[in-house]
């Protein structure tokens, strides 16, 4: 039990470190926001149900952060990392339940973080980053439905909501 608690603490230290590093480094080193983030901000000022290239959620979330933080570049890097950390958290939970081993769950998350799309490209908030947490959430809650003896309405509802938001994040989400 104590080992599991330590692994959970290590996971949260890892997640917090990831958040700080991947928010701080681009904030310090980049002179401009990435182009996809600028495009999302432009679209966010005039929200519609879709744009000529992408669905609306990649513009909606930056617009929410713009309304909260204003024109602060660091906030959009933070937004990207929040989306990545939600993915990490649900992959960690999913792996813990499927593998029934907290250590293997943590290793799964570390391996996921080594994938290019979960580190070097994440400072640029775009449709690819926007869909990440929804993939993890849909898989996790689908697993809960599959693994449970009695299907809970809330799990079904959450799968539907997260799948819908995921589809509105990137149309290729439908392949899930």
Question: Where are the model-predicted features located?
Answer:
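Membrane-interface alpha helices of multi-pass inner-membrane proteins
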Residues: 46, 154-171
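Short acidic/glycine- and proline-prone juxtamembrane loop motifs at membrane-interface regions
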Residues: 120-131
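Membrane-interface transmembrane helices that cradle and orient dolichyl/undecaprenyl
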Residues: 96-99, 138-155
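Transmembrane-helix signature of polytopic, membrane-embedded enzymes
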Residues: 9, 91-114, 132-133
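Short helix- or helix-capping micro-motifs
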Residues: 15, 105-116, 163, 167
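Start-transfer (signal-anchor) and selected internal transmembrane alpha helices
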Residues: 1-22
């Amino acid at each position: 039990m104590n080992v599991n608690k330590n692994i959970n603490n290590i996971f949260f230290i890892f997640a917090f470190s990831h958040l700080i590093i991947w928010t701080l480094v681009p904030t310090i080193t980049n002179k401009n926001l990435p182009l996809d983030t600028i495009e999302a901000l432009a679209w966010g000022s005039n929200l519609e149900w879709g744009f000529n290239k992408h669905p609306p959620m990649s513009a909606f979330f930056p617009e929410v952060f713009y309304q909260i933080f204003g024109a602060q570049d660091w906030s959009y890097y933070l937004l990207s990392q929040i989306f990545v950390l939600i993915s990490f958290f649900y992959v960690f939970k999913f792996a813990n339940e499927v593998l029934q081993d907290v250590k293997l769950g943590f290793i799964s998350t570390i391996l996921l973080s080594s994938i290019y799309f979960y580190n070097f490209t994440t400072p640029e908030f775009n449709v690819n980053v926007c869909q990440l947490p929804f993939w993890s959430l849909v898989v996790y809650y689908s697993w809960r439905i599959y693994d449970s003896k009695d299907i809970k309405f809330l799990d079904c509802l959450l799968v539907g909501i997260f799948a819908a938001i995921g589809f509105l994040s990137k149309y290729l989400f439908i392949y899930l």
